[in-house]
Amino acid sequence: MAKKAAEKSAKELSEMLLNPRKNGFFKVTDEKIEKADKFCEGYKAFLNSAKTERESVEYAVAAAEKHGFVPFDPKHKYAAGDKVYYNNRGKAICLAIMGKEGCKNGVRIAAAHIDNPRLDLKPIPLYESTEMAYLKTHYYGGIKKYQWTAIPLAMHGVVVKSDGTVIKVCIGEEAGDPQFTITDILPHLGQDQATKPLGTAFTGEDLNILIGSRPVRDEEAKDAYKLNIMRLLNEKYGIVEADLISAEIEFVPAFKAVDIGFDRSLVGAYGHDDRVCAYPALEAILNCKNPVQTVVTVLTDKEETGSDGNTGLNSEYMRYFIADLAQAEGEEPRHVLSKSTCISADVTAAYDPHYASVYEAQNSTYINGGLGIAKYTGARGKGGTSDANAEFVAKIRRTFDDAGVLWQIGELGKVDQGGGGTVACYMANRNIET
């Protein structure tokens, strides 16, 4: 007969009643670590080849088609095991595998975002000043402006000519490519700059990208440096300056993903937020076999700027996709949505001892603690968040524990310190358990 609580030692009581934080490394075998490291090699390849939302969708479509997915046809009636994808304007994508029970008991959704903080070009970006050519930018998402100066930048995106011709651009990623940069003041002249608060030392209007310093070979030419850049772009891409008006050009760090540390235990790269979730969400559905309920992975755009716009999850494209799945089976879409569940897959902050003042240690997530769960995000008094119901949190706990998943729970830093949002609220607003 089990001993009553009063008869147990303090150690036994502690093991039975308390929830101490443990280092998950010692719960994982060397074999599993080796598998995780192998998985991360694929992740690093994804980070290097898909630095923008358009490139991420191209990657997802190619991978999906290799795994038997086909473009979704809302007029077609699908059977269990069928695999489909919906490409939303080349900037967001929904993938689904039909379950044995179809949609009648709801669908199971994993949602992540594939846009990143970056520097977008202004509509009229090209100019010259003091014998140098530059591009004017408008930053996208939450950035620390000082981090974008004096680093190598690569140019990604599309230029759409007035006749509708789409020209893809990617410069700065391949060996031998030129790269670009935003200049900073050299330390010898930086005394005044150093006295400014970090948030005001660089402004958005300062983030102009240096792209050249040679003129066309004509001493009488007007705008000779700007003209030389357009000459080069015209020779390579057949575009003129006016075509930049209808372009989506993004400048991103040109760094490649690398291992961090002597033990290679971490990955350093641009775009972890949210590719560290988007890649596993994609891999999960690509390798899903015979689901009971229909499963859906959503890789969405515009999260970094509030999820508005027709490729963000505050629009209707995901709801329309699930509605089409439901109606094809004779189900009422709103009933399917209300029975559905979603994991909003986004990043949280691991405790950093060098910046301990912004964390509340007891409610932080830690390196080697496992997958991070956040019941809510938002800011201050939980503003702008979906606060997951306790019943759903319990279901997630049970699911992970039953599958042997190493996990932890925490908040995104101290209350009133800052905060962050994600797509969870837009899923929950459609009555999806999130």
Regions found by a protein language model. Name each.
Residues 1-434:
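N-terminal hydrophobic/helix-forming segments and targeting peptides
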